[in-house]
Amino acid sequence: MKKALALLLCAALTLTLFAGCGEKPPAVPVTTGEIGVLRDEAFGNIYLDLTIDAFNDLGFAFGDSVDVALPGGEALEDIPYYSGYYVPVGSPLLCGYPGYPHPVIAYNYGDPTWETYGMTDDAVVTVTLREKGKFAATQDLFSLQYSDERADFDSDQIFANFREVTGGSLKPKTLYRSASPCDNQHGRAAYANRFAEAAGVRFVLNLSDSEGTYIGYTAAADFDSAYYDALYRAGNVLMLAMNANYRADAFAATLSEALYAMAVHEGPCLVHCVEGKDRTGFVCALLLALSYATADEITADYMITYANYYGVTKETRPDTYEAIRANVDDFLRCICEAGPDAPVASLNLHDGAVRYLRRGGLSDTQIAAVETFLTK
């Protein structure tokens, strides 16, 4: 009894001391503890082995700053936790992207983190909250999430993010872009397939899938893309399974070879990834640059996707629009091998596109064939 009373008095004294100092008792750290990892097969990044909701239930929230302890004593410190890739190109973040099965440790348009950090299937990482809400202003500025319900969009075409790419000297009815006509995770595949058939698409650059993942889609009960499958069976769909690191030499080599394959096939050509947004956006920017389009034309094409998915325009969300538009500036600087502060208006986009394809391994004759396929 005396021992219990002494413990109570000690606890009361401790609380009194904290109250007298105007301080609270130390908070329990918000952390995952050591947690397993999974390889993100699409992009080669590190998934945490829990769902986004389960991660948030631990006390994390979008806009927080976190520290990530990795194997071998490596760490990513003070990085943002966002619901999208709202960091500069090449910067690290923890991302709980809507529709992803797990939070992912990634570099925005950067090297795959699984290989970068030498991860193995039995590896563990630890994520710890560093500062609550440190990046909340950026999270609030972007804070984009779209619906997968057709009824929430004005038309089937907007829902499918399907459109003809236009600008510069690009020939009419030559190049199209869309959400995936085969991967139905967002419920858009059948719509994109229907528009591809109506446009008379004869060749497809599938930037996101491998042969194996595609076969998996065709076995699903909801697969309803007969036209796309007929193109695939005829050898007219190129499965590229590319990540999003468009600055990498391997990306340039794979893409350049694919564009030459496009040039020697019958068009029109459809370019797509999953959403038809990021990888597709870069590829279309490159093809428009090769077709003598202006930076404004390339930007306008890219931003249609954000109007389609999120309703983001210059008029509806000007600050968000401008922040997203900066992605195109980085595309064009990459294509032209320009520095991060180079004025986009000073870049020769066509010559930059030619040099990019040379870096990717194409000869001048092959590059001319790609340009001839595209332009009037």
What are these regions (language model features)?
Residues 15-26:
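Sec-dependent signal peptide cleavage junction
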Residues 270-274:
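Active-site cradle of extracellular carbohydrate-active enzymes
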Residues 23-24, 102, 109-111, 115-269, ...:
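Cys-dependent protein tyrosine phosphatase-like superfamily
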Residues 8-16:
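Bacterial N-terminal signal peptides
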Residues 25-107, 113-128:
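Long, compositionally biased stretches
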Residues 1-8:
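Positively charged n-region of N-terminal signal peptides that target proteins for export
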Residues 275, 279-280:
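Ser/Thr-glycine-rich phosphate-binding loops at phosphate-binding pockets of nucleotides
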